[in-house]
Design a protein with these regions (language model features):
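Small-molecule kinase domains that catalyze NTP-dependent phosphoryl transfer to phosphate-bearing small molecules
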Residues: 79, 84, 125-187
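Post-Walker A helix-loop "phosphate-sensing" segment adjacent to the P-loop in P-loop NTPases
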Residues: 24-35
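ATP-dependent small-molecule kinase phosphotransfer cores
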Residues: 38-99, 105
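ATP-dependent NMP and nucleoside kinases share a basic, alpha-helical "lid"
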Residues: 85-143
Length: 187
């Protein structure tokens, strides 16, 4: 594994679209093996498998995810989801060159991953996806928008990179950013 990217953005700002575009560009232009893995993958798996709550895009499901992942599990172990993902990544690190985590929501997740992967010499880079003029997110209540999982990084200032998601230019912006990152690492 060469590097890990943590992507952060407001809901519906293009985190998954950005992750997919980064993956496509790394695969097609740099011939890298790229894994997209989300902290929420495990949350959704546990809810589906053990709580009989299958994933769906509803107000009730989003509330359930927020309550379960944050108030229940993180309250017990603030690094639980970061540790689950990092444990798997350590075990499979030889299989992937680039890892993209498109749902970074809490500062401690970054700290936990940096701490874990420092010993392997694998950098963890942060990326903000900023979507100007984003409209109110359909399907989210005021409480969901105010939830700590949506607001925790609002005042975070130390992103390694920022992508302005003006949808029509996003692919080009990502390509330029990936090229810049590659150039920085090779100089």
């Amino acid at each position: 594994m060469e590097k890990i990217f943590l992507l952060h953005a407001a809901a519906r700002s293009g985190k998954n679209t950005c992750a997919d575009a980064m993956k496509d560009y790394y695969v097609n232009s740099y011939h890298k093996r790229v894994l997209i893995i989300a902290f929420a993958d495990y949350v959704k798996f546990v809810l589906d498998k053990y709580y009989n709550t299958p994933a769906e895009r509803t107000e009730e499901y989003r509330t359930r995810i927020q309550q379960f992942a944050t108030e229940q599990v993180r309250a017990s172990d603030v690094n639980y989801w970061a540790n689950v993902v990092s444990d798997l990544l350590v075990a499979i690190q030889e299989d992937w060159d680039i890892v993209i985590i498109p749902d970074w929501r809490f500062g401690n997740e970054r700290v936990a991953l940096i701490s874990r992967f420092h010993e392997y010499g694998i950098p963890v880079k942060t990326m903000l996806i900023d979507r100007p003029n984003i409209e109110e997110v359909d399907g989210m209540t005021e409480e969901q928008r105010a939830h700590s999982s949506e607001r925790n990084l609002d005042n975070y200032q130390n992103f390694d990179y920022t992508i302005i998601n003006e949808t029509s230019q996003m692919q080009k912006t990502i390509q330029q950013l990936v090229d810049l990152i590659d150039e920085e690492e090779n100089n």
